[in-house]
A protein has these predicted regions:
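Conserved hydrophobic beta-strand within the GNAT/NAT acetyltransferase core sheet
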Residues: 56, 90-94
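Acetyl-CoA-dependent GNAT
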Residues: 6-64, 72-77, 81, 85, ...
Length: 138
């Protein structure tokens, strides 16, 4: 899959809580040894891989397909990949008002472990805190 195809899928999945990445960001991601772009049908994730940690920078499902359990299935695959990779834990940030995503992460035993004040800018331009969540894999 080309970097442009990854980017176009990302644009279908992005929502008001997402960090906005550009095509140039995706080109840098493809060259990085520590960044992995995972794709599964109409889902995409951007992961940072370090010694014993996987950080989910972005995970999304195409808007037209949300509410069908695809995000849960994809997250389960990311967790399995992280275990195979040898990670001890997974971290991510989620908007404080993104209740569906917070509930999904909690259902996989992610726990809240911090807050990033004014981390996201939503479509109206106002700021929103992000909750840092962590899943221990051991």
């Amino acid at each position: 899959m080309s970097v442009e195809e990854y980017f176009n899928l990302y644009k279908k999945c992005v929502d008001i809580w997402s960090i906005q990445f550009s095509l140039e960001d995706f080109k840098r991601f493809q060259k990085s040894r520590n960044i992995k772009i995972e794709k599964e049908k109409n889902c995409i994730a951007i992961l940072s891989l370090t010694d014993r940690e996987v950080e989910i920078y972005f995970i999304g499902v195409a808007e037209s397909l949300r509410g069908r359990g695809l995000g849960k299935k994809f997250l389960k695959n990311i967790i399995n990949f992280s275990k195979y990779y040898g990670a001890d834990f997974i971290t991510l940030e989620v908007g404080i008002n993104n209740i569906p995503a917070k509930n999904m992460y909690s259902s996989f035993n992610f726990i809240e472990c911090g807050i990033r004040k004014n981390y996201y800018r939503n479509s109206s331009g106002s700021r929103e805190d992000a909750i840092i969540m962590k899943l221990n894999l051991n």
